[in-house]
Amino acid sequence: MKKDENLLKDLWFIAISAAGGFILSLTGISIGWMIGTLIVACCLAMIRPAWLMMAPDQKGINRRWLALGQMILGIELGQKLNLSVLSVLKDHWFSVGVMLILSILLAMLSGYVLWRFSKTDMMTSFVGTAPGGLSAMPSIAQEVGANTAIVSLVQMMRVLLVVLSIPFLVILIYTKQDRTASAAAETISSATTDFRLAPVLWTVILILAAWGACKAAKFLKFPAPWLLGSMLGVAIVHVGGAAVTGHDMTAWWLSQANHVSQVFLGATIGSKMYKSMFAGVTRIIIVGFVSSVGLIAAMFLSAVIVSELTGISLITSVLAFAPGGIAEMATTSVTLHADSTFVVAVQVIRVILVIALLPPFYRLLHHLHGEKKDKKSSISGSSA
């Protein structure tokens, strides 16, 4: 009985929070559902109105919603690793490698700046500036013990700056190229909304692969196992299926699944926020804004250099380097006749690498930093 009551309360909280997501989605921003839901959920969690039926000591809604949101997101990300992406990686491995390494190094430099010049802790700073996507990084922040409120704020700021500035910037430098662009939907995901037997069966196989991989990732104590496990499980099965058949297997996958994932993630993360998380937020916003602008400027400069060295068009290079907004960058690349397959390939591979590799690295960095602090305190204690 109590379980049913808690489930209804959770659904009530998610439904109200999702209204904010729906309103912001009308702006056309691809992560509007996540941002709107997160903002409303955060406000509700801090105000706790009586009609919300949320106990004063309740620490947010059940974590199962976060796991479900992560799993849906992981399945979607895993499907993006298709033959087109692998073909780009094979043909342009040097250019892609340089872009990925520079992107991650510049993001880490941005995190270091945020850590040194604001009062936030090291883990929060690095996770907050990692270019792994607004949908993924706040949930990873929960897993690694970072401040989810600050991570969400910094990620939100960076993604909005990228989405609002990069497309206009490349339009200013746009010169028509005699190159045909792939369809954005085809580049972004091998999925269809047509309800046919073969795509539905393939979807069931992908979901089962995601579930099994999530359980394995949880057993192996991976960070964000529901996200990382489902993403890797689906990617392996998806690429394996394509290798056997010689073409990308098509799954039945509605675009609304992404919206549902964003709502679950935004509502869960927002529900666990409290006022003390925003201590010193003004300074963090200022430093975060400056570091995000610096990151975008550095990425743009790097894109110019890579374009000169490799012969990739400047517009393609800038859109591929942009630290966030996969859907927006893909759409812009198609509109401006840039190489949309290359743009999405670099963006997708970077997100997958960041989600898979950086959390363990941050944990190690955090551990080493903690040991260094302990050593310093023991030395100062013995000298006293």
UniProtKB/Swiss-Prot annotation:
Keywords on record: Cell membrane, Membrane, Transmembrane, Transmembrane helix
Transmembrane segment boundaries: 11-31, 33-53, 66-86, 94-114, 153-173, 197-217, 224-244, 284-304, 309-329, 342-362
Principal location class: membrane
GO biological process per UniProt: regulation of gene expression
InterPro entries (alphabetical): AbrB_dup (IPR017516), AbrB_fam (IPR007820)
Subcellular location: Cell membrane
GO cellular component: plasma membrane
Membrane topology term: Multi-pass membrane protein
Similarity annotation: Belongs to the AbrB family.
Official protein name in the record: Uncharacterized protein YhjN
Organism the protein comes from: Bacillus subtilis (strain 168)
